[in-house]
Amino acid sequence: MKDGAHHRPVRRTISLVLAGGRGSRLQDLTENCAKPAVHFGGKFRIIDFVLSNCVNSGLHRIGVLTQYKSHSLLRHLQHGWSFLRNEVNEFIDLLPAQQRVDEASWYRGTADAVYQNIDILREHDPKYILVLAGDHVYKMNYASLIEDHVALGAPCTVACIEVPLAEASAFGVMTVDAMRHITRFDEKPAHPQPMLDQPEQALVSMGVYVFDADYLFAALQTDIEDAASHHDFGKDLIPAIVSRGEAMAHPFDLSCVKSSPESPSYWRDVGTVDAYWAANIDLTATIPQLDLYDKDWPIWTYQPTSPPAKFVFDDEGRRGMAVDSLVSGGCIVSGALVRRSVLFTGVHLHSYSSVEESVLLPEADVGRHCRLRKVVVDEGCRIPAGMTIGFDAEDDARRFHVSADGVVLVTVAMLEALRVSQA
């Protein structure tokens, strides 16, 4: 484990993972599950990255706050994250919306979700609360972040990263002075403020916050009494704390876990089909910026029992082969060609087909003589023999969902609708 993972501030910290969001920008990928439960990287779920960061940082007291279509997420956590031991005060508590405050209230926002569980948090007597978005992909040593929070001496610390100005309107945009005080915070502004020394960049919140526990509890109480509040960290709580001059910034570079010092810091909000596709395809690089093979900082998950991947046939024009790709257990590449793609568990590709720059989720089946390029195929899809996807934008748009950057999303429901229309 990395240095600093077991310092006392970490042992006095409870981590809260906000995992209740629908993630509607991912279109039909979140039709049946919350965004943190979406598959990623060949064998993982998105939430595995933030939970692995917690465990690898020595944070073993974790609450996961869920709401939207949480069944698959809860099942994944029960199967893959039950190894922490309650008898030594380690746990992952599942905290679905239970109308704890009044019978009419589900979680009305991210801040309200934490507020409704204050009584549970107080039982553990934490000194610090680490609040984490459960839908981002990155590797971070939270112990370093918490130690920085303690050293800075402010009651609230917000982790931040630089992004291109053109992308900043999707995030909370921050202005920070030379001493790292946050002087301004705008949630998803239409016209984001650029960095003073880098006019093409903006400094944005990563959705990662550290609070002194008693301070957070008081701030949440004040927020809940404000009838005009959305009860959201980004929209309400953080701007209010910034306005009082009580929030500090923590640059991601200070705690990013990298394979080598010269590697760039990698953090992705995979909240759109384009971003989701791109982050998966990033992993096919010879040396990807996000290293899944780092034994010092493993990404933990639940992996169902499956046989090894298999590649069969070696005939001219019918050769089972994958190049610059991730191929998971249980896959069968039968006389098909795969280039720069990610195949999740149990994918089956039949003869004479080709798959390029595509992401195929578990148990997808691609028939003979198919051609796929820049496609995301949802779990359990069966692509009929001879189908071509990703080569004709107009034809693709009539049948499936085509993103702004030309990624084609294919789901079981779309294929069924197409079958019915052609019957």
Curated annotation (Swiss-Prot):
Cleaved signal peptide residues: none
UniProt pathway annotation: Glycan biosynthesis; glycogen biosynthesis
InterPro entries: ADP-Glc_PPase, ADP_Glu_pyroP_CS, GlgC_bac, GlmU/GlgC-like_hexapep, NTP_transferase_dom, Nucleotide-diphossugar_trans, Trimer_LpxA-like_sf
Entry-linked Pfam families: Hexapep_GlmU, NTP_transferase
Enzyme class: transferase
GO MF annotation: an example: ATP binding
Residues that, per the record, bind alpha-D-glucose 1-phosphate: Y107, G172, E187, K188, S205
GO biological process, one term: glycogen biosynthetic process
PROSITE patterns reported in the protein's UniProt record: ADP_GLC_PYROPHOSPH_1 (PS00808), ADP_GLC_PYROPHOSPH_2 (PS00809), ADP_GLC_PYROPHOSPH_3 (PS00810)
Coiled coil (UniProt feature): none
Catalytic activity: alpha-D-glucose 1-phosphate + ATP + H(+) = ADP-alpha-D-glucose + diphosphate
Statement: the UniProt record of this protein carries the keyword Cell inner membrane: no
EC identifiers of the protein: 2.7.7.27
Alphabetical UniProt keywords: ATP-binding, Carbohydrate metabolism, Glycogen biosynthesis, Glycogen metabolism, Nucleotide-binding, Nucleotidyltransferase, Transferase
Positions of disulphide bridges: none
HAMAP family xref list: GlgC (MF_00624)
Record-stated family: Belongs to the bacterial/plant glucose-1-phosphate adenylyltransferase family.
Subunit: Homotetramer.
Function: Involved in the biosynthesis of ADP-glucose, a building block required for the elongation reactions to produce glycogen. Catalyzes the reaction between ATP and alpha-D-glucose 1-phosphate (G1P) to produce pyrophosphate and ADP-Glc.
Descriptive protein name: Glucose-1-phosphate adenylyltransferase
